[in-house]
Amino acid sequence: MGVDPRMLGPASPEVGPSTGAPLEVGELVRWAAHTAIPCQDAAGWRPLRGSAAAGHRAGVAVLADGAGVSADLRPGCEHEVDWFSTALVTAVLDQLAPTDALGPVVGEPVALSDAVAGALDAVRAQHPQCDADAGPWATLVVTRALGDELEYWVLCDSSLVVQFTDGQVLQLLDERLEQVAGGWRAGGPSPTQTMNTPGGWWSARADVRAAGQGLTGSFPLADVRAAWLASDGATRPIELYRTHDAQAWGEAVAQDPWALAHGIRAYEAQREAALREAGTKVHDDIAILRAV
């Protein structure tokens, strides 16, 4: 898979000091992967030209991390990956927590998978001049606090990390992309050949069938101390660097998410040559949104 060359540059700049405090519900840590992509400071919510986007509204949390690939792998669309990620997050929020709602939902609430399908259709309709099936794509994580439950829907390699009231931490991650990538490295089909195909891996692109492919479930809210939606750039310490397991990552983000983000960037800067030699992006977008 081609990699956006902006993602292979020097270390990202500092983006504000550690606050020494946990995130409040709905708060976000977001740090773009490269100096060529303007970053967002700790307090602001202004748009970020990185691939990750996130939002929180009325108990619903959504994070989308667009694939930072070169334009030749998304030839059907004139829009950048960050446009797609932002549009997708907004569309999911509009499906589940519309800003023009006049009161509580009457009847059965829409299922998360149905909301994702509606959001994919809505984003496609926003750029009819493009071939959305050959356009950008993203990972997607959605949670909703509904009644006594925390519902979730997870697709591709962004994560939902839940810290329970007993202190245990669980990471929910769709591992199909990594399984396909492992087969590709062993001589099998490439991820681009197997994306959104039966037996392959799935992403949020334009195919509404992806809505039926997310990992779904729920937890009693009474058992949940905190939950975070996280891009794979934020969970690199678990999957790539092996410096943390899910338990240690959850404890770190609960204590000081900015310190965790700075630690990731410092680790990457120290190992830049080795990461390049391995064909790995030196940096990836960090996005962590607290859902509950």
Predicted regions and their residues:
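Catalytic core of PPM/PP2C metal-dependent serine/threonine phosphatase domains
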Residues: 42, 102-164, 194-220, 291
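N-terminal entry segment of metal-dependent catalytic domains or homologous docking segments
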Residues: 1-92, 214-218, 233
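Glycine-rich phosphate-binding loop plus the immediately following alpha-helix
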Residues: 169-204
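Short helix/loop capping segments that flank catalytic or ligand/cofactor-binding pockets
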Residues: 71-72, 162-164, 237-239
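Short hydrophobic beta-strand that contains or immediately precedes a catalytic carboxylate
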Residues: 61-64, 153-155, 228-231
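A short catalytic or substrate-binding loop motif that flags glycine-/basic-rich loops and adjacent residues
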Residues: 34-39, 132-137, 280-283
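Helix-loop-helix
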Residues: 86-120, 247-270
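C-terminal catalytic subdomain
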Residues: 4, 191-292
